[in-house]
A protein has these predicted regions:
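Conserved "HGTGT" condensation-loop signature of ketosynthase/thiolase-family condensing enzymes
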Residues: 1-218, 226-232, 240-386
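Phosphate-binding/switch region of NTP-binding enzymes
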Residues: 237
């Protein structure tokens, strides 16, 4: 699973030259040559012995200087190569970090949940129940779309002034549902010419996010509507609407949050995945809240340990960083949304978006109870790189 990011090139730092042994060898060699020359001179009384001894010492010194120069040159080349490799690895890491922190800007969120579902803006404790929370019987698609679009009416009017908008209804939407959407859209005095229709395909959430982040999706915004409000639906019922756009689009709206690139993993949250997630999605290092479900909750402690190690490593490198004064607040999704089944991922991400917008702080979601397992950072505002 995880991101397919290539490993950095190996860096081989050369050992610094050690001259102590060579220096002793030079001194011993020179001393031996001088003593030999002096001995021959006193034995044979031949002054040429002193000349030869002096020449031998000079040759030894020049030989030592040549070897030392070659060693210093080789050491400098290897040191420069290691430093260049380090800088190249740092450049690649920065590029992958920018890639990992790309995301979609959330310009508006509308929700429809049972009264027991507490939003971050509400006071009081979460519901603390594992039972599914139910809505009254749905009066119809017209009521559903009206309740979701009415709070977003002003944001939609501003958004579609200069940008087109692609509307994505659930894959189960019928022709009658589309007709109801058209009628509600027109009733809110929104121009029909500004929107494009797109049926929401049954893609996993991470795959859907990847499709929205592709370059050909930059030309349009996205109105996403998902709900779990049918007679046969299981788990907590509700409905959500998101107004998404690519960071390159100027919408004229104040961003609520940024959904950063999804990190695919498995249910056990392997340590290697946690380290890679924190290393490349750097905005997660400033998290003030971490959300988990029944599957990932037992593994959150290892995420906290990995986060602490990441902060320690950055501090040892002497790099500037924003270290939270306290550990991130742990949020348990069933305490907010009850027992979830259908629409679990969309409802969970919606809660995290609302918390990031309310606290103006980064939140991290670890979700694995649904059809896929992933980690994702949700930062406040529209800054998609920490």
């Amino acid at each position: 699973m995880a991101w397919k990011i290539p490993a950095p090139d190996a860096v081989h730092w050369p050992a610094a030259p050690s001259w102590s042994g060579w220096w002793r060898a030079l001194m011993l060699s020179c001393s031996a040559v001088v003593m030999a020359g002096c001995g021959i001179y006193f034995w044979l009384h031949d002054s040429r012995a002193l000349v030869y001894a002096f020449a031998g010492v000079v040759v030894l010194i020049l030989l030592f200087a040549g070897i030392a120069g070659w060693w210093m040159y080789r050491y400098g080349v290897l040191l420069e190569h290691a430093d260049g490799t380090t800088q190249y690895n740092a450049m690649l890491e920065a590029q992958w970090q920018r890639w990992a922190q790309e995301g979609m800007v959330v310009s508006g969120v509308s929700t429809l949940f049972p009264e027991q579902v507490r939003t971050p803006q509400d006071s009081g404790e979460p519901v603390s129940t594992l039972a599914p929370l139910r809505l009254p019987e749905c009066p119809g698609s017209t009521y559903l779309f009206t309740e979701l679009l009415a709070p977003l009416r002003v944001a939609l009017q501003i958004f579609i002034r200069n940008q087109s908008l692609t509307v994505c209804l659930p894959e189960s939407a019928s022709e009658d549902d589309w007709q109801c959407f058209w009628s509600v859209w027109a009733a809110l005095s929104l121009p029909l010419s500004a929107i494009q229709l797109s049926e929401m395909k049954p893609e996993p959430f991470s795959r859907q996010m990847t499709l929205w982040q592709q370059k050909d999706a930059v030309r349009t915004g996205w109105l996403i509507i998902r709900h779990n409000w049918t007679p046969g639906s299981e788990g907590t019922q509700g409905a959500v609407a998101w107004l998404l756009s690519h960071p390159d689009i100027r919408t004229g709206l104040r961003p609520c949050a940024t959904l950063h690139r999804v990190f695919p993993t498995d249910n056990t949250l392997p340590d290697g995945d946690l380290r890679q997630f924190l290393q490349y999605q750097c905005v997660s290092n400033t998290m003030k809240g971490v959300w988990s479900d029944a599957v990932t909750q037992p593994h959150i402690s290892r995420l906290m340990v990995a986060l602490s190690q990441q902060h320690k490593a950055v501090a040892e490198q002497g790099e500037a960083t924003v270290i939270p004064p306290v550990s991130p607040v742990q949020q348990y999704l069933p305490h907010w949304l009850g027992e979830m089944k259908d629409g679990e991922t969309w409802f969970a991400v919606t809660q995290v978006i609302q918390m990031a917008e309310h606290t103006r702080e980064t939140q991290v979601l670890a979700l694995a109870k649904g059809s896929e397992a992933f980690l994702m950072s949700v930062s406040s505002g529209g800054d998609n790189v920490a």
